[in-house]
Amino acid sequence: MSKYSYKIATLAEGVEGLTNVETLGTCDKHVAPRGLDEFEAFSVYRTSASGLEYGDGYPHTVWHFDAIQEPQLTALLAYLGAETNQSAQVYITTRIADRTYKNYRAVMHRPKASEREPGNRTKYTVWHNVDVRFTMLEAQ
């Protein structure tokens, strides 16, 4: 049974097809992202002429994996479609500021290869500090 409720689905699968991230790939140890600290309700914050700050734009979140095995990462990145795609629209379930989970339609961005750190080589390669960004979140 999954410990967290981070989920993902393609546009074709819809919200009904959301799959728990902890079940992706065939590996020894599945992990969930640490997404709570990275949820922002707005894209940018601006200061009005009166000096008050307000939020503008879509919410966004980052799923940060301290360590993730290659099969789980490959299965997660498959939601981008082709290996050359840098982003794609998907459905996700992610944790928000009040510690509840909510469904969104979002744009998923491929993590930069230069930002991933290869870790120990056991049965599977383990990648460290992998960030998967989701922008333009629209509540479903």
Predicted regions and their residues:
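Extracellular/virion structural assembly segments
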Residues: 1-140
